[in-house]
Swiss-Prot record:
GO terms for molecular function: growth hormone receptor binding; hormone activity. Disulfide bonds join 52-163, 180-188. Keywords: Disulfide bond, Hormone, Secreted. One of its GO terms (biological process) is positive regulation of receptor signaling pathway via JAK-STAT. Its main location: secreted. This is Somatotropin-2. GO terms for cellular component: extracellular space. Growth hormone plays an important role in growth control and is involved in the regulation of several anabolic processes. Implicated as an osmoregulatory substance important for seawater adaptation.
Length: 190
């Protein structure tokens, strides 16, 4: 295999994370439009199903906190977040059979796996092949539920999609912080 420059690895990882975050936001909006009446949208944001497992790990919650962490830590957090979604996203296409979600769900899983490989490559290049992230987040998210006629299931899936969107935003932020820190660019915005 030819050596890929570190800057290219970061660029590819950031692009994948941006794409996944946008896809997660689109899926969330499509689900909301299709399944959640306006009056339920606000009440569900405060429900226990809106709790994200990622809130249980000591990961930075924004770019200012992320800038205080090492690149290795940010990569470990990113890998833990991504790996917590791999199993749940395998079932996504079975849940939403007739919408934008269905059309994009297989792509989401593939892109998530690509991003996981990219982060593993970055960790290897930065000398962090030990993958210390396994201790960060042992939990994975629940599977998406297929019974969309049940309100509890709707809220659960809505909460999962909300968490996926938040987690992909975190990964995107962490990767951008690392890239900007390492490669001073004129268009480096967070």
């Amino acid at each position: 295999y030819p050596m890929i420059p570190l800057s290219s690895l970061f660029t590819n990882a950031v692009l994948r994370a941006q794409y996944l975050h946008q896809l997660a936001a689109d899926i969330y909006k499509d689900f909301e439009r299709t399944y959640m009446p306006n009056e339920q949208r606000h009440s569900s944001k405060n429900s226990p199903s809106a709790f994200c497992y990622s809130e249980t790990i000591p990961a930075p919650t924004g770019k200012d906190e992320a800038q205080q962490r090492s690149d290795v830590e940010l990569l470990q957090f990113s890998l833990a977040l991504i790996q917590s979604w791999i199993s749940p996203l395998q079932s996504l296409s079975r849940v939403f059979t007739n919408s934008l979600v269905f059309l994009t769900s297989d792509r989401v899983f593939e892109k998530l796996k690509d991003l996981e490989e990219g982060i593993v490559a970055l960790m290897r290049d930065l000398g962090e092949g030990g993958f210390g992230s396994s201790t960060l987040l042992k939990l994975t998210y629940d599977m998406f539920d297929v019974n969309l006629r049940n309100n509890d299931v709707l809220f659960k899936n809505y909460g999962l999609l909300s968490c996926f969107k938040k987690d992909m935003h975190k990964v995107e932020t962490y990767l951008k912080v690392m890239k900007c820190r390492r490669f001073v660019e004129s268009n480096c915005t967070l």
